[in-house]
Design a protein with these regions (language model features):
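Amphipathic C-terminal alpha-helical segment
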Residues: 92, 112, 134, 153-171, ...
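Helix-loop "lid/cap" segments that line or gate small-molecule binding pockets
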Residues: 71, 89-94, 103-112, 138
Length: 191
């Protein structure tokens, strides 16, 4: 028996299916099959696909917040915390190569669909942007903190997109190395 409620199982399955297949190409039937429930039981928990999408976005936000909070506890200084952010590319490289970045692919798809939840999905990037800005401020780059945060977000998204396009793990490793070197310049105050 799973520790997750049926509703939580549905959200977790939808999260994975939206990531792998895309929001538009994932149906109620796909999610119900993944959780092994009837469509009728499914509708008890969610009436619309948009309700599931909102729950998936909230799940991703909660997961990312918990991850950032963990880094705040584990990593002693802002440079180490930023390094943990960069390391996501290495830790998730197999999934990135196969499916792209879960945040980037969802926000891009919702933008293409002109979906009303696009702004909600953008909160995922805003969470990282705000957190990275705080880390660069803690490194002493108050006037440039947001610029540096956006630069790092753009680089990480570019790496994920190109690694997915070229299915190239070596590229990810190479770019992560460059990002670490870039970060070290700012951490040492030589940038």
């Amino acid at each position: 028996m799973s520790d997750l409620s049926k509703r939580d199982q549905i959200i977790a399955a939808a999260d994975q299916l939206f990531y792998r297949n895309g929001f538009e190409h994932t149906s109620f039937a796909h999610i119900a099959e993944a959780v092994n429930i009837s469509r009728g039981n499914f509708y008890y928990h969610f009436k619309t696909k948009d309700e599931i999408l909102a729950a998936v976005i909230n799940l991703r936000l909660a997961d990312k917040r918990a991850m950032l909070e963990q880094w705040e506890i584990e990593d002693k200084n802002p440079a180490e915390r930023i390094r943990s952010f960069i390391k996501i590319l290495i830790l998730n490289r197999a999934k990135i190569i196969r499916f792209g970045c879960p945040l980037g692919t969802l926000t891009t798809e919702l933008t293409k669909l002109d979906h009303s939840a696009q702004e909600d999905a953008n909160r995922l990037f805003t969470l990282f942007r705000s957190w990275l800005t705080q880390q660069f401020q803690a490194l002493g780059y108050n006037n440039r903190a947001d610029e540096l945060a956006m630069h790092l977000l753009a680089r990480s998204q570019g790496v994920a997109t190109l690694a997915n396009a070229f299915t190239d793990e070596k590229f990810i490793r190479q770019e992560v190395k460059h990002l670490y070197e870039w970060l070290d310049q700012y951490a040492e105050g030589v940038a």
